[in-house]
């Protein structure tokens, strides 16, 4: 029986090191484990999707909303071997096998990353298609060998289409700066609001008017344009999104010391958090809270007017020491000398607690959704045929998140990041209750 997937992770992984230096094997396993931990904040299930482009780890929540994908290049591993199809021993059926794992099964294996970093010398991952198992072997010091067998189900991975490069606003920030900006928020914070103008960026607590006595602190953090590696604002806007997935992406970004790119447009449109490194690429698509239709239409009108006034972005060269001239628009900037962040944190007085729910938000019109065809495949539905609303479960306040189903799942191997994304996502469940959720099915 030929293994469907065979991986070795050892010392060949080079990450921001001189050519004569390599990262220790434990650090490679730590990066792999951090990716799994980040995806665990999205869903209770994990897909292993091998291809000639590398190994993709995918995750999507039970509502087919929040989506995450981390693609490891083949050179990330010491040895990478995969097959597009597998022939079972007892039958002549050839299957295009992709592994869907329960997060409850695989997450404990990579939970204690500090111990793995110190003790693991080599990690080997391969599949036993005849027994529907993924075998994870750790070769540790002093000849200790740990073997984990995780059962999987054959399932086609989900493909998401979203054209993030067409977003009006793009921010690129170092994880150190972003971690300092969100340190004021408590672990119970469910959503945060990102407000941007050409002069500053504000990250603040969402739903100030709906807070009760148990959550009566309203926090704001202002970040200047000079703190960003890249700063482009095409429209002044405010978006509210789930805080849980953001923390997972930030933790993963800190592990590989790579900046985070944020792409977004109007409220109700999806936002993308992406990490592009030498040997891996990560993309997370999150929902934003949909505004009232009247406000959304006014924002679109404002965007068109601002687009006419603002010229194409001209990048400043901070390395050459060139100053920004009057020809450079104020809404785009490259990183210069870092400045201190300044915060504004004030307690909020609550006069009444009768109506603590946030205003009713209507779902934006969906672009595509998935419906089963007679042959079991998935097809696209036009935008005009979808116009319902959906409540966010587990929240005491009435909120409506703009949501639509992702593109049809396909067994064809496609590059997950060469295609544009066009999906919206809803907030996932609480991270503290991660192990209580049931596995979703597609």
From Swiss-Prot:
Family: Belongs to the rad9 family.
Region spans: Disordered: 370-392, 422-442
Keyword set includes Methyltransferase: no
Domain of life of the native organism: Eukaryota
Phosphoserine modification, residue list: 387
A Gene Ontology cellular-component term: checkpoint clamp complex
Record's keyword terms, sorted: Phosphoprotein
GO BP, one annotated term: mitotic intra-S DNA damage checkpoint signaling
Designated name of the protein: Cell cycle checkpoint control protein RAD9B
Quaternary structure and interacting proteins, as annotated: Interacts with HUS1, HUS1B, RAD1, RAD9A and RAD17.
Originating species: Bos taurus (Bovine)
Name of the coding gene: RAD9B
InterPro entries linked: DNA_clamp_sf (IPR046938), Rad9 (IPR026584), Rad9/Ddc1 (IPR007268)
Residue ranges of the TM segments: none
PANTHER family, per the entry: CELL CYCLE CHECKPOINT CONTROL PROTEIN RAD9B (PTHR15237:SF2), DNA REPAIR PROTEIN RAD9 (PTHR15237)
Pfam families: Rad9
């Amino acid at each position: 029986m030929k293994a469907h997937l065979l991986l070795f992770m050892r010392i060949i992984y080079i990450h921001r090191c001189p050519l004569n230096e390599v990262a220790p094997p434990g650090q490679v396993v730590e990066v792999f484990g951090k990716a799994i931990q980040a995806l665990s904040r999205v869903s209770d299930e994990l897909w292993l999707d091998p291809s000639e482009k590398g190994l993709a780890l995918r995750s999507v929540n039970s509502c087919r909303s929040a989506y995450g994908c981390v693609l490891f290049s083949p050179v990330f591993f010491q040895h990478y071997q995969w097959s597009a199809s597998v022939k079972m021993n007892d039958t002549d059926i050839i299957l295009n096998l992709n592994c869907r794992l329960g997060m409850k099964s695989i997450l404990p294996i990579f939970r204690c990353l500090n111990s793995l970093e110190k003790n693991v010398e080599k990690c080997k991952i391969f599949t036993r298609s005849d027994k529907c198992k993924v075998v994870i072997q750790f070769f540790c010091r002093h000849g200790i060998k740990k073997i984990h067998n995780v059962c999987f189900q054959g399932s086609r991975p989900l493909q998401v289409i979203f054209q993030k490069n067409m977003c009006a606003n793009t921010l690129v920030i170092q994880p150190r700066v972003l971690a300092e900006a969100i340190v004021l928020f408590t672990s119970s914070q469910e959503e945060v609001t990102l407000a941007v103008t050409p002069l500053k960026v504000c990250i603040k607590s969402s739903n100030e008017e709906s807070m009760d006595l148990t959550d009566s602190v309203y926090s704001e953090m202002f970040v200047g344009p000079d703190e960003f590696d890249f700063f482009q604002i095409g429209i002044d806007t405010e978006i509210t999104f789930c805080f849980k997935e953001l923390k997972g992406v930030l933790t993963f970004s800190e592990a590989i010391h790579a900046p985070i790119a944020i792409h977004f447009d109007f409220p109700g449109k999806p936002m993308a958090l992406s990490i592009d490194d030498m040997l891996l690429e990560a993309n997370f698509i999150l929902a934003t809270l949909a505004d009232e239709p009247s406000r959304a239409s006014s924002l679109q009108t404002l965007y068109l007017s601002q687009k006419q006034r603002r010229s194409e972005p001209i990048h400043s060269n901070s390395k050459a020491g060139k100053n920004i001239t009057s020809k450079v628009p104020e809404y785009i900037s490259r990183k210069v000398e870092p400045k201190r962040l300044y915060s504004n944190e004030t307690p909020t007085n609550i006069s009444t607690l009768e109506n603590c729910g946030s205003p009713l938000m209507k779902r934006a019109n969906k672009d595509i959704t998935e419906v089963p065809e007679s042959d079991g495949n998935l097809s696209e539905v036009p935008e005009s045929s979808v116009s319902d609303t959906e409540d966010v479960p587990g929240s005491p306040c009435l909120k409506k998140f703009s949501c639509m189903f992702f593109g049809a799942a396909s067994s064809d191997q496609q590059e997950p990041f060469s295609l544009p994304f066009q999906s919206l996502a809803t907030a996932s469940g609480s991270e503290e209750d991660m192990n209580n959720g049931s596995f979703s099915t597609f």
